[in-house]
UniProtKB/Swiss-Prot annotation:
Belongs to the peptidase S1 family. Kallikrein subfamily. Residues 1-18 form the signal peptide. It holds the Pfam family Trypsin. The lineage of its organism: Eukaryota, Metazoa, Chordata, Craniata, Vertebrata. GO terms for cellular component: secretory granule. It catalyses: Preferential cleavage of Arg-|-Xaa bonds in small molecule substrates. Highly selective action to release kallidin (lysyl-bradykinin) from kininogen involves hydrolysis of Met-|-Xaa or Leu-|-Xaa. This is Renal glandular kallikrein. PROSITE patterns: TRYPSIN_DOM (PS50240), TRYPSIN_HIS (PS00134), TRYPSIN_SER (PS00135). The active site is at H65, D121, S215. SUPFAM superfamilies: Trypsin-like serine proteases. It comes from the Eukaryota. It comes from Mastomys natalensis (African soft-furred rat). One of its GO terms (biological process) is regulation of systemic arterial blood pressure. Transmembrane segments: none annotated. Residues 19-24 form a propeptide.
Amino acid sequence: MWFLILFLALFLGGIDAAPPVQSRIIGGFNCEKNSQPWHVAVYRFARYQCGGVLLDANWVLTAAHCYNDKYQVWLGKNNRFEDEPSAQHQLISKAIPHPGFNMSLLNKDHTPHPEDDYSNDLMLVRLKKPAEITDVVKPIDLPTEEPTVGSRCLASGWGSTTPTEEFEYSHDLQCVYLELLSNEVCAKAHTEKVTDTMLCAGEMDGGKDTCVGDSGGPLICDGVLQGITSWGPTPCALPNVPGIYTKLIEYRSWIKDVMANNP
């Protein structure tokens, strides 16, 4: 089962013992404090839902399948439960999913099918007021060049450090290094569609991965933001089954146009 599908089951159905969606970095480590100042925590009401990326003082990029009707975000967080004076809480004025993302895939009664296409899994979220850019809250640039297969990539997120569905969440922001693989590797590993607007990254030996709720968080390859977490298998971190990320170089023009046309 894809962790995106698990995301939907938890988000729509809920779990008594845990928030409906949580990040899960497998085989990672505590990120150095304030080393990921562009990483955003996206909440629905007071429940953590997804990751995101700060693109400028007004805009956050996340996954389209993280769409909800009651957003709030935290910027500059390291530990989700500690009072961190340098962190910033923000409300949202609008959310704009990519028009090519099939929102019907998010319906509660949707039955997953191998022909489902989760391309265009990205969404822009505008803050109600500009973020204050500081040492711990900083935007990151969009890519200007294609990523290179074999690159060393860094993914980050909050949550479980185990690959099962036990939801043992981490309080601290976790980081994990992954290898950028060819899309052919992911096409062989998954029965679902892997398209040219996706990136394939993981550890072929298993044990390192992103998973449920890391959706929308950054994939930074050789120091450049190249993707955001989209979908993958559960359990996470299986051998020979890398994860899928939205390929941002394919959407640079759309992102820039939306930001320019919604001042």
